[in-house]
Regions:
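A polyampholytic, Gly/Pro-enriched intrinsically disordered region
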Residues: 22, 112-113, 139-144
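ATP-dependent adenylation/nucleotidyltransferase module used to activate substrates
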Residues: 1-112
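Local cysteine-cluster metal-coordination motifs and their immediate loop/turn environment
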Residues: 40, 119-140
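Structured loop/turn residues at beta-strand edges in well-structured enzyme cores
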Residues: 49, 116, 130
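Short Fe-S-cluster ligation motifs
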Residues: 136-138, 142, 148-169
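Short loop/turn hinge sites at secondary-structure boundaries
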Residues: 124, 145-146
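Conserved S-adenosyl-L-methionine
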Residues: 2, 114-122
Length: 169
């Protein structure tokens, strides 16, 4: 039962915090073959509606965190598999796969993304925890870009001490 081996599918396993996973090649947050399953479903849907592209949200930090199915190598290999389709050619694209969180934040600001409508936290609650690895990575991206994340966090973030400014569109 794959639901029992990941902190993202089993509420009895604590979600890893940044301090817990440094140097760990495969964290407890890993869900076996998650991206492959979701991309397979997305490709099946794309074929059924005549779409030729599926977009995957993998970022540079995913492969750095040990998620093999968020890596450039995975993207290349899964595209080789989709190319075997004799009926419709569907290409999986991951435009953020080589981008840091800082670059993604900067890109979002450039295109006026409403970050308040995005959610990253692994805890699955309405208010982000600010401590899981996903929140830590997101927070670092905003700090490195010099902006205040408009998403509410369960812990206080002293944005001012980092010299961050509000996003203004």
């Amino acid at each position: 039962d794959i639901a029992n081996i990941s902190s993202l599918t089993n509420p009895d396993i604590d979600v890893a915090k940044t301090r817990d996973v440094l140097g760990d090649p495969q964290t407890v947050n890993y869900v076996p073959f998650r991206n492959m399953m979701m991309l397979s479903i997305a490709c099946a849907y794309a074929e059924s509606v005549g779409a030729s592209d599926v977009f995957h949200g993998a970022a540079q930090v995913d492969s750095q965190a040990g998620y093999w199915d968020g890596s450039v190598e995975f993207l290349e290999q899964i595209n080789k598999v989709t190319a075997l389709n004799r009926r419709d050619q569907i290409r999986i694209q991951a435009p953020l796969i080589d981008k840091s969180k800082q670059e993604i934040v900067e890109m979002g600001i450039k295109y006026k993304l409403n970050f308040a409508k995005t959610h990253t936290c692994y805890e699955g609650k309405e208010v982000a925890c600010g401590e899981c690895t996903a929140c830590s990575s997101r927070l670092k991206g905003f700090v490195d870009a010099g902006y205040i994340d408009p998403v509410p966090y369960a812990k206080d973030i002293d944005w001012e001490s980092y010299g961050c400014k509000s996003i203004e569109y």
